[in-house]
């Protein structure tokens, strides 16, 4: 995984520099779409086929996109460069790094919230507000329900984890009692 991140970083940074000259959100949508298309087994099969030219592969990728940027010269050049350098499989990692650059620019971060029970709108808003104060940045929440937590929440922001779940507390008590 580390080598994928290392290889993908220059592509993500170059695309981000291009995006800074326009609409970063639109470019983010484009790269997310590309990442989804690039993960399809059929696309990977066609891309690796010696019977299909690199230009045809690039056209196939661009044709599968809904983003209006897909018809632009910069998007075409980016996709063609990835195809020519056999880097289509890197698109999910490129998209992830692009999103991280976008979040850094906006002073924001993605947050994964895992809760034992579904969170209502007001509960989620209150939780996100308190987490934004704690982490001192704007958070973009993705919520998941995991009943094995028993109660509470587990919050992941980047490489920081805040686990206030009942399961984590019980595990801590068990470790203290058996030590």
Swiss-Prot record:
Record keywords, A-Z: ATP synthesis, Cell inner membrane, Cell membrane, CF(1), Hydrogen ion transport, Ion transport, Membrane, Transport
Cell compartments where the protein resides: Cell inner membrane
What domain of life does the UniProt record list for this protein's source? Bacteria
- Subunit record text: F-type ATPases have 2 components, F(1) - the catalytic core - and F(0) - the membrane proton channel. F(1) has five subunits: alpha(3), beta(3), gamma(1), delta(1), epsilon(1). F(0) has three main subunits: a(1), b(2) and c(10-14). The alpha and beta chains form an alternating ring which encloses part of the gamma chain. F(1) is attached to F(0) by a central stalk formed by the gamma and epsilon chains, while a peripheral stalk is formed by the delta and b chains.
Name the record gives this protein: ATP synthase subunit delta
Q: What does this protein do?
A: F(1)F(0) ATP synthase produces ATP from ADP in the presence of a proton or sodium gradient. F-type ATPases consist of two structural domains, F(1) containing the extramembraneous catalytic core and F(0) containing the membrane proton channel, linked together by a central stalk and a peripheral stalk. During catalysis, ATP synthesis in the catalytic domain of F(1) is coupled via a rotary mechanism of the central stalk subunits to proton translocation.
Q: Key word Membrane present in the record?
A: yes
Recorded hits in PANTHER family, A to Z, give: ATP SYNTHASE DELTA CHAIN
Family, per the entry? Answer: Belongs to the ATPase delta chain family.
* Membrane topology value: Peripheral membrane protein
- InterPro entries (alphabetical): ATP_synth_OSCP/delta_N_sf (IPR026015), ATPase_OSCP/dsu (IPR000711)
Q: Which SUPFAM superfamilies match?
A: N-terminal domain of the delta subunit of the F1F0-ATP synthase
Query: Which cellular component appears as one GO term in the record?
Result: proton-transporting ATP synthase complex
* GO MF, one annotated term: proton-transporting ATP synthase activity, rotational mechanism
NCBIfam families noted in UniProt: ATP_synt_delta, PRK05758.2-2
């Amino acid at each position: 995984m580390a080598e994928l991140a290392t290889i993908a970083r220059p592509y993500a940074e170059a695309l981000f520099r291009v995006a800074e000259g326009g609409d970063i959100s639109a470019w983010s949508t484009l790269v997310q779409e590309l990442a989804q298309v690039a993960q399809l087994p059929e696309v990977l099969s066609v891309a690796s086929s010696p019977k299909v030219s690199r230009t045809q592969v690039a056209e196939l990728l661009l044709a599968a996109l809904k983003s209006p940027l897909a018809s632009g010269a910069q998007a075409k050049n980016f996709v063609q460069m990835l195809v020519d350098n056999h880097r289509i499989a890197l698109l999910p990692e490129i998209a992830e790094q692009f999103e991280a650059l976008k979040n850094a620019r906006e002073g924001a971060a993605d947050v994964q919230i895992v809760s034992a029970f579904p969170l209502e709108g007001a509960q989620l808003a209150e939780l996100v507000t308190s987490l934004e104060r704690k982490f001192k940045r704007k958070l973009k929440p993705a919520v998941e329900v995991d009943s094995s937590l028993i109660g509470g929440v587990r919050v992941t922001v980047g490489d920081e984890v805040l686990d206030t779940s009942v399961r984590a507390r019980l595990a801590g008590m068990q470790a203290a009692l058996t030590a």
